[in-house]
Amino acid sequence: MKILATETKLGRRVQSGGCAIHCQNCSISQLCIPFTLNQHELDQLDNIIERKKPIQKSQVLFKAGDELTSLYAIRSGTIKSYTISETGEEQITSFHLPGDLVGFDAIMNMQHPSFAQALETAMVCEIPFDILDDLSGKMPKLRQQIMRLMSNEIKSDQEMILLLSKMNAEERLAAFIYNLSQRYSARGFSAREFRLTMTRGDIGNYLGLTVETISRLLGRFQKLGVLSVQGKYITINNMAELIELSGTNKNKIQLII
C-alpha cells in the first residue's frame, strides 16, 4: 500500500489511498508490523494478511463484545475507537492513522471492549490473531515489533490521561493539533498543512471539551497567528508558539507519534 499525495484547490497535500500487493511496498511499513523483518519473514507475514476492500465512511470495523479474530493494520484513512456508556453516551478513546494497528485492547479477554469506525474511506490489512500469535513465537523480530507497538499504545494512553488531568482547554487543543502534525510528518506528510479527518465534535469528545470551546479556541489560535483554518484544513504558521501554547514543556509531557 502506498500512501499518495494529491493537491487540492487549496494547494494542500492530502492523504489518499492506492493499492499495492506486498508489505515491502507499503510506504508506512516502518510504522507497522513489517518494520525490522527480513525478506523471508516478510513473505511469511504477507501470506497470512488479507487486504480488505475499502471500508466506507461510518462503517464499523468491529463492535464492543465481538470476539477477537484479527488485528487490523490501517493502510490509508482514519479510524476512531470509542466506547458507549450504559446511558448510550459515546466516548472516543483514539484516532488511528495509517501505520497504526487496531485491536490490541482485545487481547487480554479475547473480546473487543470498544468499537472501531471509519471516519473516511479507509483501507486495512486484516491479520488473523491466532496465526500472528503463532508466528510471533517463531520469529523474535516479529514478537519484538508487536511488543513495541503495544508499548507505544500504552504510552499513548498514559499521555492522554496526563493531558486531560494536567492541561487546560487551550493546552489540550494545542497539544492535540501538535501531536497530529507530528503523526502526519512521521507518515511522510507535511507537519504544517493537513486535513482534519475528524469533526470538531469528535475532537471535543476526545479532549473532554464542547464543540463551542473547540471553535472558540481555533478562532483564538488564528487571531494569534499560530495557525490558519479553512474548513477542515489546518495550516500551522508558528510551530514554536503552538508548542508553547500546548504546555507540553511545562507539564513535561512528551506526546508520542
From Swiss-Prot:
- Note the SUPFAM superfamilies from the entry: cAMP-binding domain-like, Winged helix' DNA-binding domain
User: Which Pfam families has this protein been placed in?
Assistant: cNMP_binding, HTH_Crp_2
Q: Which InterPro entries match?
A: cNMP-bd_dom, cNMP-bd_dom_sf, Env_Response_Regulators, HTH_CRP, RmlC-like_jellyroll, Tscrpt_reg_HTH_Crp-type_CS, WH-like_DNA-bd_sf, WH_DNA-bd_sf
List residues of the HTH crp-type domain: 167-240
Under the heading SMART domains, the entry gives:
cNMP, HTH_CRP
Required co-factors: [4Fe-4S] cluster
Entry GO CC = cytosol
**UniProt keyword annotations, A-Z:** 4Fe-4S, Activator, DNA-binding, Iron, Iron-sulfur, Metal-binding, Transcription, Transcription regulation, Virulence
Kindly summarize what the UniProt induction comment says about this protein's expression: By anaerobiosis.
**The organism sits in which domain of life?**
Bacteria
Q: Where is this region: Essential for the oxygen-regulated activity?
A: 23-32
Q: Does the keyword Transcription apply?
A: yes
Q: For binding [4Fe-4S] cluster, which residues are annotated in this chain's numbering? A: C23, C26, C32, C125
Q: How does it assemble?
A: Homodimer.
Q: What role does this protein play?
A: It is involved in the activation of genes necessary for anaerobic respiration. It probably also activates genes involved in the production of virulence factors.
Any idea what this protein is called? Anaerobic regulatory protein
Species of origin: Aggregatibacter actinomycetemcomitans (Actinobacillus actinomycetemcomitans)
